[in-house]
Amino acid sequence: MNLERWTQAAREALAQAQVLAQRMKHQAIDLPHLWAVLLKDERSLAWRLLEKAGADPKALKELQERELARLPKVEGAEVGQYLTSRLSGALNRAEALMEELKDRYVAVDTLVLALAEATPGLPGLEALKGALKELRGGRTVQTEHAESTYNALEQYGIDLTRLAAEGKLDPVIGRDEEIRRVIQILLRRTKNNPVLIGEPGVGKTAIVEGLAQRIVKGDVPEGLKGKRIVSLQMGSLLAGAKYRGEFEERLKAVIQEVVQSQGEVILFIDELHTVVGAGKAEGAVDAGNMLKPALARGELRLIGATTLDEYREIEKDPALERRFQPVYVDEPTVEETISILRGLKEKYEVHHGVRISDSAIIAAATLSHRYITERRLPDKAIDLIDEAAARLRMALESAPEEIDALERKKLQLEIEREALKKEKDPDSQERLKAIEAEIAKLTEEIAKLRAEWEREREILRKLREAQHRLDEVRREIELAERQYDLNRAAELRYGELPKLEAEVEALSEKLRGARFVRLEVTEEDIAEIVSRWTGIPVSKLLEGEREKLLRLEEELHKRVVGQDEAIRAVADAIRRARAGLKDPNRPIGSFLFLGPTGVGKTELAKTLAATLFDTEEAMIRIDMTEYMEKHAVSRLIGAPPGYVGYEEGGQLTEAVRRRPYSVILFDEIEKAHPDVFNILLQILDDGRLTDSHGRTVDFRNTVIILTSNLGSPLILEGLQKGWPYERIRDEVFKVLQQHFRPEFLNRLDEIVVFRPLTKEQIRQIVEIQLSYLRARLAEKRISLELTEAAKDFLAERGYDPVFGARPLRRVIQRELETPLAQKILAGEVKEGDRVQVDVGPAGLVFAVPARVEA
């Protein structure tokens, strides 16, 4: 026995048989050990060979395992070191068979032939030899890795035409133009290799699946009838190719098989760019170069699919590129997407066991097109339908909220009952009786509701079964019509099909008024998924939200005092957006806030973010003092290629990509470099911006606020002279025109001039600032009370028409917070104290009324 003349796989099988014998503590390696190794996997070569020869590999495997269990166990160093004479004879016979078959190496299939001769109850040698020839495709074993080239197409490819015949592919709606163009190229004499090029998610693979379905139906020209489309899996080809030349050998076997089929097989490679450089190593040939000769001669027909960006990989190799004919696949329109979804609807209904309404389909196409901008139709719309249906299915399979709430209440009462059982006083006993009565009532109610829910679920289960049967019957009709079994087709179409359709309709009708089972995916479900993905509120306005929007001014006034014009302008823009009346191609609103420092420009932006999103974190704040130099502008959209930081993207674009629905504040806009305004023009007009990576970022769901101190001296001067608000506004506008270009000012929705704060407004701000301080003190369980005189004192000290409300914060810090902090540290004010503040001759006076001890 010469192991040098065995293939790698055969040597490995023998080594594994030895390991098995050692692990099971058997004296020697015998036939059952080798059989157990060879039949370990259903996809193994031995298993496939025995199946082809008409044997039952599963029964053989079980028989050999029983035989292994019967072998005696031994101890010592000699375990599993020898071959039995039976196995030794079989291995020598394998070498003789190798000569007979004109092979250079003993392969795994040759071993199977030799072992089968030595094992009773298996097919004869001639039957096995016939199966072996079929499996090898008429080739002999000339290399050490020959097994990986057997039946290469079956091993490394997926037959799409077979899947289409079995009804396992989704229907392909539309795309007739592209399919016709692919057929046209495939029918050419040479260079008959179409490559589908398009953005991810537009349906390139679906076009090939559509072609496979047409071939199965016979709806193709004569030259393509009866052909097979096999999808080549590059991953499978590369996986496990450990040795130099093994990958090339596998690919060569695939190419050979396709060439030998004489045009019967059309190869399909998804992600075609992977063939460039696949298997490339030092001195090795990559897949692209191996495919070139067969492609050029027209011996091999290949359909490729790749994205626009990745097609560049193929363009780098002009000799490979010229062998392909590009077919550009555009993104379908919203209307075409709706047709595609209507065609797919049934598949998803059967899979999830729910109904998908037509309004949900229209919503999926329109909302995904409008709000999910980084992905393509129809993929993103299909994903929405799929996820909404999965969500409804999950809700159907878990206990309804009504029952869940009652069960939780019952559990709470049971815990209470157990605690009361230990008490002996009359009150507790009385309470115990009441609880037991309530538990009994709840148990009865839960049982009644559960029975109703179970009844509805049973109807739902029957409905799903009927839908699956209906799907199978439709597939059978299609198959019968293809095979011209018209009697069977008529029997199913006019007998079985109407019966099942009526059953599905009747069961659906029963569930229509169901209490717990909601069977239909609606427009609202789709809107909720979009909101979940993007953070943009697109679902219907709930009553609470309507109230909030109608009272938006009140909400904003809780934190921003005065400035009615600014608050009204912002609130109106938000209401227009949520009512669906805003221009879909522009931001929700763009405002320029002007006015002296400290009057609430930045505070209004923060308040808006907190009101809309319940957190100030939803505000993207860009401080324009950081963008005073020309080179700093690139930080907004990202550094250009080749510069440090290119990979990180822009500070503005990345923030908006992560949170498309937000308030963007450009603070102190007049301090920015003029080039920043060129970037803003695009955002304000088109609601979009392209970053340094070429990605389009959507600003259509943002509120853009720019603040500036320009014209502040004019505003103060005007107020001192008693000018009306309109005149002040006009004067400030003149200053703006000197500083900003007309095309920038013209794109803003509104330019709002903030008024300086009056004494009365400062007094209101004192209350707001004190509420923040009280909230901080509440954490220490200290309450704070100020007399009206103390509040007036703070307002008087903090009033400055030039600096706005900011001096007030400093006064509160100095006059109130600092003395209070000293008293807390000195122990004069402790947890649980009530601090009263009044005005004395020297400033504020603090008093702590005597604590009442509990």
From Swiss-Prot:
UniProt-annotated stretches for the region C-terminal: 757-854
Coiled coil region boundaries: 382-516
Reported impact of residue 667 to N: Decrease in ATPase activity
Record note on what altering residue 350 to C does: Great decrease in chaperone activity. Retains ATPase activity and oligomerization
Single GO biological process annotation from the record: cellular response to heat
Effect of residue 167 to C: Great decrease in chaperone activity. Retains ATPase activity and oligomerization
Ranges annotated as spanning the membrane: none
Pfam families (alphabetical): AAA, AAA_2, AAA_lid_9, Clp_N, ClpB_D2-small
Record keyword Cell membrane present: no
InterPro entries for the chain: AAA+_ATPase (IPR003593), ATPase_AAA_core (IPR003959), Chaperonin_ClpB (IPR017730), Clp_ATPase_C (IPR019489), Clp_N_dom_sf (IPR036628), Clp_R_dom (IPR004176), ClpA/B (IPR001270), ClpA/B_CS1 (IPR018368)
Family matches, as NCBIfam families: chaperone_ClpB (TIGR03346)
Oligomeric and partner information: Homohexamer. The oligomerization is ATP-dependent.
Protein name: Chaperone protein ClpB
Protein species of origin: Thermus thermophilus (strain ATCC 27634 / DSM 579 / HB8)
This protein's encoding gene: clpB
